[in-house]
Amino acid sequence: MRPYLDLLRDILDHGCPKGDRTGTGTLSVFGRMMRFDLSRGLPLVTTKKLHLPSIIHELLWFVSGSTNVRDLQRHGVTIWDEWADDNGELGPVYGRQWRNWNGAIDQLAGLVEQLRRNPGSRRLLVSAWNPSDLDAMALPPCHYAFQCHVADGRLSLMFQMRSADVFLGLPFNIAGYALLTHMLAQQTGYEPGELIWCGGDVHLYLNHLEQARLQLTREPYPPPTLKLARKPGSLFDYRYEDFVVEDYQAHPHIKAAVAV
């Protein structure tokens, strides 16, 4: 995860002070990219411990189409609680857009079908940015779209973020989309290729600066590996226990407040 550490350093060295919706304040840069070769391991940050169950359950929650945090809470995952209403609802966020766009289109099912039938297509896209639904969302999508690409028997995925909380959120996003790439590749008969991240407003909150500096003092460990324990019948049939992450060695967790 050297690219991630380089990004932290880039923001600390070149970021511009900027106000934000939460009132916390940020150091921000604009327009950045990172690439990860998934054949070399799973891109999990090792300079602080990540809570892997939250990453896996969040991805499965997105894929299921759910928008209610109670479906996460039953697995002990609380990362979305701050934005939910009294009934646990978040409005038409990621799961709704991926699985039921405008009440009619299952984008994920369509993507899998196209990967099987027309893998050379340049339209292998899924979007969560639905302008007609934005006002009803508890939080508009930060990672708003992803695109797949197939070449030389490998499936690669690029995802775009309009806003990237680099210390807290981005490590989860990178890991989650890496898992999704493995799932899509397995379901469609390819090897996992590259994971590519593109960020718009890429920032560190001002109350995360010391934590970022601490992370930069730590030497990263080799990346862990991912094995999928079985091949489910469809993209929508994966379970938590299907994801076997081996040799994840990491430095201790670093506590930081979420900007709501």
Curated annotation (Swiss-Prot):
Q: Which UniProt keywords apply?
A: Cytoplasm, Methyltransferase, Nucleotide biosynthesis, Transferase
Pathway field of the UniProt record reads: Pyrimidine metabolism; dTTP biosynthesis
Q: Which InterPro entries match?
A: Thymidate_synth/dCMP_Mease, Thymidate_synth/dCMP_Mease_dom, Thymidate_synth/dCMP_Mease_sf, Thymidylate_synthase
Binding site residues for (6R)-5,10-methylene-5,6,7,8-tetrahydrofolate: H51, D165, A259
GO annotation terms (biological process): dTMP biosynthetic process; dTTP biosynthetic process; methylation
Can you state which reaction this protein catalyses? dUMP + (6R)-5,10-methylene-5,6,7,8-tetrahydrofolate = 7,8-dihydrofolate + dTMP
**GO CC terms for this protein?**
cytosol
Which family is this protein grouped under?
Belongs to the thymidylate synthase family. Bacterial-type ThyA subfamily.
Q: Which PANTHER family match?
A: THYMIDYLATE SYNTHASE (PTHR11548:SF9), THYMIDYLATE SYNTHASE 1 (PTHR11548)
State what protein this is by name: Thymidylate synthase
What gene name does this entry carry?
Answer: thyA
